Amino acid sequence: MPGPIAVKLRVLREERGLTQKEAAELANVYYRTLIYLESGKRPPYMPTVTKIARAYGVSVEELVEED
């Protein structure tokens, strides 16, 4: 089961009406990286999380904090 960051990434992307490919392009990360992050198959590295947070208009803290 994907971890909390993976779930948040997917939810934020879907709330913005973006496909994984569109979100990856917006965040300037590899498409497969985003797929792996959302599925929990890759650990979230801070530089990548920072790019995605900026693209989604949220803080890094919002992505990494546990609910």
State what each model feature region is.
Residues 7, 17-18, 44-47:
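Residue-level signal for the short linker/turn that defines the boundary of a DNA-recognition helix
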Residues 1-15:
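A short, Lys/Arg-rich alpha-helix, primarily the initiator
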Residues 14, 28, 39-41:
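Residue-level detection of the helix-turn-helix DNA-binding "recognition helix"
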Residues 13, 24, 53:
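The alpha-helix within a helix-turn-helix
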Residues 28, 47-62:
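DNA major-groove recognition helix of helix-turn-helix/homeodomain DNA-binding modules
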Residues 66:
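Short acidic/histidine-centered micro-motifs embedded in hydrophobic/aromatic stretches
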Residues 10, 21, 32, 50, ...:
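Residues within the helices of the helix-turn-helix
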Residues 18-36:
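Short alpha-helical DNA-recognition segment
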